[in-house]
Amino acid sequence: MTKSAELYQKAQTTIPGGVNSPVRAFNGVGGSPIFIDRADGALIFDADGKAYIDYVGSWGPMILGHNHAVIREAVIQAAQRGLSFGAPTEMEITMAELVSELVPSMEQLRMVNSGTEATMSAIRLARGYTGRDKIIKFEGCYHGHADSLLVKAGSGALTLGQPSSPGVPADFAKHTLTARFNDLDSVRELFAANQGEIACIIVEPVAGNMNCIPPVEGFHEGLREICDQEGALLIFDEVMTGFRVALGGAQAHYNIKPDLTTLGKVIGGGMPVGAFGGRREVMQYIAPTGPVYQAGTLSGNPIAMAAGYACLNLLREEGNEKRLAAKTKQLADGFKSLADQHGIPLLVHQVGGMFGFFFTEQETVTCYEDVARCDVERFKRFFHLMLQHGVYLAPSAFEASFTSLAHGSKEIEATLEAADRSFAILAAEAKA
């Protein structure tokens, strides 16, 4: 038995399912999860000492690579001055100014501790600002585990085969309306049936929790137009796409200005940080300047702010945005080319520093219904073949994968060699 298997067995005694977030349990791919001991650059090392090229990146935050020396030093320096104060610090201002500079639609913002906190708070603010209760989200999109957002959700909820979670009262769920991603008509129908009742639309601008699905042409422009016509707010959940799809987020990439934006993952440089922000007049509704309450003991934590500030400053250096996108495109194109060579039907999507692939003969995958028709069993087999060859992909067919600036030509070539061998095995098995 491996050390990882021993740890997993031991963990299940005191931790439900042996993990602190469901997707880590490998339920989506089968088998026993690997337990990580350390990480550096593009590599993670498991409890048995085996190295893997990592395309999970802590589910997105490690955009510079693991254990970056500058971020590590920023954390050490901040920790020497104190771990938490529960009072304002100058670094919170500095960090907010930098985020607002990089994402100009966020004229004001509030720091929180996670993406879930950010989306939960943004929804509450939208309801308070508009005086309306209902919200629209999209089937297969995941916005954290707040009750009102666990309705036809993506991510781990899809892996469990249970998109709407038990424990969410019907009285909460009835205020959450679901539309089809990339389908403006489904959005218009909801507004027509709920005149003057919808506070906001919340959307992942690139759906990263049913793998990786970009918007079709005109989709975001249509959402912006509908919100303007109906007096609703448009919320971009950029927890995953923020600073990764482009330095200014997906809203910069697609040239759309949302009313509110939520951030997480990259903004903390590996520390637990989230943020929500947007138009000044909307943000003024948050306490203490307005009536909508939101608070957090550890919000704006000085160590987390130091890590996030160091990360974003490094990321904004000239050329990094293009380098990250180029690395990711090279990898995505390589996967597609190799799959074609081996006769494996594969559809690959890539936007900036995130990518995803679907084992399917469909020509397009644009929504949850398309994702549900993909070959999950073949993905499971491919995942374990790649793992055996030292490549760690997201352990779910419904999760996007991520590159970092630490992924060099050596790591990408090794990954494509592993993919070549894995596709060859899949092809041979299909003929057997």
Swiss-Prot record:
Reactions catalysed according to its record: (S)-4-amino-5-oxopentanoate = 5-aminolevulinate
UniProt GO molecular function: glutamate-1-semialdehyde 2,1-aminomutase activity; pyridoxal phosphate binding; transaminase activity
HAMAP family in alphabetical order: HemL_aminotrans_3
Main location: cytoplasm
InterPro entries per record: 4pyrrol_synth_GluAld_NH2Trfase (IPR004639), Aminotrans_3 (IPR005814), Aminotrans_3_PPA_site (IPR049704), PyrdxlP-dep_Trfase (IPR015424), PyrdxlP-dep_Trfase_major (IPR015421), PyrdxlP-dep_Trfase_small (IPR015422)
Subcellular localization: Cytoplasm
Matches recorded under Pfam families: Aminotran_3
Record-level GO BP terms: protoporphyrinogen IX biosynthetic process
Enzyme class label: isomerase
Cofactor(s) needed: pyridoxal 5'-phosphate
Assembly and interaction partners: Homodimer.
Entry keywords, A to Z: Cytoplasm, Isomerase, Porphyrin biosynthesis, Pyridoxal phosphate
Residue positions, PTM N6-(pyridoxal phosphate)lysine: K265
Gene from which this protein is expressed: hemL
Pathway(s) it belongs to: Porphyrin-containing compound metabolism; protoporphyrin-IX biosynthesis; 5-aminolevulinate from L-glutamyl-tRNA(Glu): step 2/2
Domain of life: Bacteria
Gene3D superfamilies the UniProt entry points to: Aspartate Aminotransferase, domain 1, Type I PLP-dependent aspartate aminotransferase-like (Major domain)
UniProt family annotation: Belongs to the class-III pyridoxal-phosphate-dependent aminotransferase family. HemL subfamily.
Name assigned to this protein: Glutamate-1-semialdehyde 2,1-aminomutase
Enzyme Commission number: 5.4.3.8
GO annotations of cellular component type: cytoplasm
